Amino acid sequence: VTDRAAPAKAPPGERRVLAALALAQFICSFAGSNMNVMINDISRDLGTTVQGVQISITLFLLVMAALMIPGGKLTDRYGRKRCFLTGLVVYAVGALLCAVAPGLGVLILGNSILEGVGTALLIPPVYILTTLLYPDVTSRARAFGVIMALGGIGAAAGPLIGGLITTAVSWRAAFVFQALVIAVIVGLSRRVRDPLPPDPERPFDTGGAVLSATGLVLIVMGILAADNDLRLMIALILLGALVLAWFFRSTRAKERAGREPLLSLALFRDRTSNLGLITQNVQWLLLMGTSFTVAAYLQVVRGYDAVRTGVIFTAATLGLLLTSLSAERLAERRSQRTLIMAGFTLSVAGVAVLVALVAAFSTPWAFVPGLLLIGLGLGVMLTPSVNVVQSSFPEEQQGEISGLSRSVSNLGSSFGTAIAGTILVAGLTKGAYAAAMITLAVIGLAGLAAAARLPRAPGRTAPGGAPSGAAPGTEARPPLPDSGQPPAPRRPHRA
């Protein structure tokens, strides 16, 4: 029986460990949102275009999506602390490279590749170590609450902090800020211990990791090519689909042969979970698509600077934080299906308000009501969608499904900046802005349709995070704000 008694106050050493893990989540969430307000400054300084910055942001999110599951698998083989520290170093090198980037190519190498790889290596250990170091439900919930709070602050305040740094110093200073935070985390990490030994003999599906990552990259690059070459777009998307089909066929063959694949196909056999994954993907697509589109429009078409753009986005930040803080109370009163549908309804309404008011008024205040509605909607539905997915599986599959869940969310983020951003940068006019936002609204309606097909009865969250009637041990893991929760730890494999 799990001991739910309140644990003693954590000693200073444990608090420093938690600070290291929470700051790691903060900086990764910050990196996912702060660049949107630097579009003009980066474009002007590096002699590139809005599309160039869009590619860098999209690829960063895509690299996270493609490598989050492999990153979680590597922790079993090489150890959680080693992967955590390696990820921090890789991330810091990428941030410093961005700070001195002479052109777009180096920025993509530093931000999209190195920071993306670093995030995929360091985020899985954050959640795995928290699960291992805080074994009782109460202390673990408190630890996850601290980590999620810092992650939420990083994601929500990223545009404002990034805008202030860019306006006061330079966009390059924002990357130096990231490197400094990483240095603090490395110092705090000296007290981090790994309760489980690494298992160098544990198999790793290298072929599966390469195939899945290649397929996702080809599809997203195809979307980015849409405004330049339609035939190239079609070719890349078709090729990506073929590579992913190859990945799933290879995975099935490995399972039949008794080998451990990158991802178990059993995760896709539950209808409720599949619908939940769709809603997660669409939610993050809406969030990042709207963020990039509105930020680019404000800076390029309206001519606003980074700090003014960041201030406007505080409306969405406040909305998201308000409903996120009320998530537990809402879950006790309404089913998860109802909350997800309400979230999509609010978010789509927010997009419609953004299109209507921005077309009618030139004041910055025209953006506030729509962004507030979108923030309120996202805050209502993000956690219920994760709970729907997590609670569909027993304890032994929680690790794999949580990794898949976060990868799907990050993939939605990259789709959002790719799809909406591509439509916007094709014209950079009011018409292109409206077209991008309407496209997001239509995709949001598709998410609403998926949510409507979720089961009606299950979903009210019982104490501990599991829906009422869920099997013991299926408590949903706390979700990440913008970069995924990894697979939970496994005991070392023995041949």
Model-derived features with residue positions:
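Extracellular/periplasmic helix-loop-helix junction of adjacent transmembrane segments
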Residues: M38-L67, G103-I108, V307-I312
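Helix-breaking motifs and short loop linkers at transmembrane-helix boundaries and internal kinks
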Residues: D45-G47, G79, V100-V106, V169-S170, ...
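12-transmembrane solute porter fold
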Residues: E14-V37, V50, V126, V243, ...
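Central cavity-lining transmembrane alpha-helices of secondary-active solute carriers
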Residues: T58-G72, I123-Y127, T314-S326
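Structural signature of transmembrane alpha-helices in multi-pass secondary transporters
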Residues: L21, C28-S29, I57-F60, M64, ...
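Helix-loop-helix hairpins in multi-pass membrane proteins, especially solute transporters
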Residues: D76-G207, E395
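Hydrophobic transmembrane-helix bundles of small-molecule transporters
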Residues: T167-Q280, L286, Y304, V311-I312, ...
